[in-house]
Design a protein with these regions (language model features):
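NTP/phosphate- and nucleic-acid-binding module
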Residues: 1-423
Length: 423
């Protein structure tokens, strides 16, 4: 694809110093555009990144037997009244609630527990119909009083929410723990190192839940972890500030050998064991093998693809721009031509024919401007075709400083092998 016809181009204007790194780089590089505080358009580059993130999530969830669907975002009040959450003060603070012209009350979705349970009530009759594992990717709305930090905290954002329904607590936790492990794999494939942190259930459940946190100085969350300086200690203690009862420097309550340290972090996922709260409230039961009516055991699991994109930029950047992990980059190659356009066209065609995604900067601007734009956009590889390189191609990785001269076949082999390794 040619950059000369790509929409939009990167921007040259300066941004406020207090703007978050993810907002500054994503807006400047043309990945997103801000409509208002907490609401962003995913431009073509940003859309490609989020789609790559979604595809990784989708692949791993499908392996667990989960099925994808799509549910409404506009919810009638009566379904939420069944659980009492419509009038819950904590819910009312974040849920957009309003009346239509007939006076009927509705809410914009910030989650889908009630909607899934309502669906199960129509579809589930006996234990033979369970378990059920369904998920969707959809826009969520939250009346966020602190819509800041770029796309890390918004009023409107993309969320993947998975829901599982089971015949027993044992079966629920079996799948819950499987998803916990799958989340770690998902984040690893995306390129993020995460900590699994015990947390409160918030407005979802009175049980403790688990969050997946990325360490970052710009994070709004505070977590407390066991500082295992002794390599023989394999303690995994980690809690967020809402449930941790101690302070920095305390002895670890789990291993009693190490001390507790606090850190700032960005939450990129969460999972909730909901139990039978929703099925009992909404009167959704199944018939067991002995003919008895039993409540469904329920759990929910969230990941925010747009928040992940913001977290990636906060973690992977330098003073020149973004450094995308190879698994989620919008294009693998940024191709630069310096007065050898015919040759560049041929190389671009060969690369695309080999299944490599290329953005070809064919604009009539200086080499320095093209190189700066390559660094800003942050694709894994920059290729340069020029008189100086002869019949070779200058090959440079975004997160490295070395420049190599490679043949086209070598480039295809190098990039192709790396792309294949990540799938």
């Amino acid at each position: 694809m040619k950059y000369s016809t790509f929409f939009p181009k990167s921007r040259k204007q300066e941004f406020k110093d207090d703007l978050s790194i993810n907002a500054k780089y994503l807006i400047k590089a043309g990945y997103i555009d801000q409509l208002m505080a907490g609401s962003y358009t995913l431009l073509p580059l940003g859309f490609r990144v989020v789609e790559n993130i979604k595809n990784i999530i989708r692949e791993e969830l499908n392996k667990t037997g989960a099925q994808e669907l799509l549910m409404p975002l506009l919810h009638p009040r009566d379904i939420w009244d069944q659980t009492g959450r419509w009038s819950d003060p904590d819910v009312k603070q974040i849920m957009y609630q309003f009346k239509d012209i007939h006076g009927k009350e509705f809410g914009l979705s910030f989650t889908h527990e009630e909607i899934v349970m309502n669906l199960l009530g129509k579809m589930i009759q006996s234990y033979k119909d369970l378990p059920v594992k369904v998920y969707h990717f959809s826009t969520k709305f939250r009346n966020e009083p602190r819509a800041k930090s770029g796309i890390l905290r918004g009023r409107e954002f993309m969320m993947k929410d998975l829901y599982s329904a089971h015949v027993s607590e044992e079966d629920m936790y079996k799948y819950y723990n499987l998803v916990k492990d799958v989340y770690i794999k998902i984040f690893k494939r995306i390129g993020l190192d995460v900590l699994t942190v015990e947390a409160s259930g918030g407005v979802f459940t009175d049980k403790n839940s688990h969050e997946f946190q990325v360490l970052s100085d710009v994070g709004e969350d505070t977590i407390y972890t066991c500082d295992c300086s002794d390599k023989s200690c394999d303690c995994k203690f980690s809690q967020n500030k809402e449930i941790f009862k101690g302070q920095d420097g305390d002895k670890c309550p789990e291993c009693d050998d190490c001390i507790i340290k606090s850190a700032k972090s960005i939450e990129v996922g969460n999972i909730f064991p909901l139990g039978t709260k929703y099925s009992e409230s909404q009167k959704v039961f199944y018939t067991d093998s002995e003919g008895n009516q039993k409540p469904i055991w329920f759990a929910s699991y969230g990941i925010g693809p747009t928040r992940i994109m913001g977290a990636l930029v906060e973690v992977f950047h330098d003073d020149k721009g973004i450094i995308w992990p190879k698994s989620v980059a919008p294009f693998q190659v940024y191709l630069v031509s310096l007065n050898k356009n015919d040759e560049a066209e041929k190389v671009c065609s060969e690369l695309e024919g080999a299944g490599i995604e290329v953005l070809y900067d064919d604009r009539d601007i200086s080499a320095g401007e093209k190189f700066a734009n390559a660094d800003l956009l942050g694709f894994p590889y920059r290729l340069v075709i020029s008189e100086k390189s002869g019949d070779k191609i200058e090959f440079k990785e975004r997160n490295g400083s070395d420049v190599e001269l490679l043949s086209l076949d070598q480039v295809i082999s190098r990039v192709g092998e790396e792309t294949e390794r990540l799938t």
